[in-house]
Structures are given as C-alpha cells and as structure tokens.
Amino acid sequence: LLLISAMVGSMIAAVPEEESLQLSEDERGGCLPHNRFCNALSGPRCCSGLTCKELNIWASKCL
C-alpha cells in the first residue's frame, strides 16, 4: 500500500514539472527548438534562436 501511494505521489509531482516546461517555452516566445517552429498559440511564425519572428509572405522562412 505504501508503494502504491508513493507511485501516485510521484505521478502527481511529475505534472507540475511538465507545466513549468510549458511556461518556459511561453516565456521564450513560444519557441519549440526541436522543430524550429513556434507553438500554435504564437500564430504562424517560425523560430530564430530563442525568439519567434513573423514568416515572410512569399516564403516559409524566418525574416
């Protein structure tokens, strides 16, 4: 029983860590470094470094 309660506690503790990662992405302007694009909430923009920039109208490249 103690083992089960410890497992449930660790699962609950893992959720705030994921939320804090989400917050850090939002603080950086919604940048997703693994695919070099911004998250959907940022709109149609792509990443350059740690900030998001508007897409060029004629090409899908960062300005």
Curated annotation (Swiss-Prot):
Disulfide bonds: 31-47, 38-52, 46-62
MF terms (GO), sorted A to Z: toxin activity
Compartment(s) of residence: Secreted
GO CC field: extracellular region
Tissue: Expressed by the venom gland.
Coiled-coil intervals: none
Signal sequence bounds: 1-14
Pfam families registered for this protein in UniProt: Toxin_7
Maturation-removed propeptide residues: 15-28
Keyword hit for RNA-binding: no
Function: Insect active toxin causing rapid but reversible paralysis in crickets. No activity shown in mammals. Does not show effect on mammalian voltage-gated calcium channels.
Record-stated family: Belongs to the neurotoxin 01 (U2-agtx) family.
Protein name: U2-agatoxin-Ao1v
Protein species of origin: Agelena orientalis (Funnel-web spider)
Source lineage: Eukaryota, Metazoa, Ecdysozoa, Arthropoda, Chelicerata
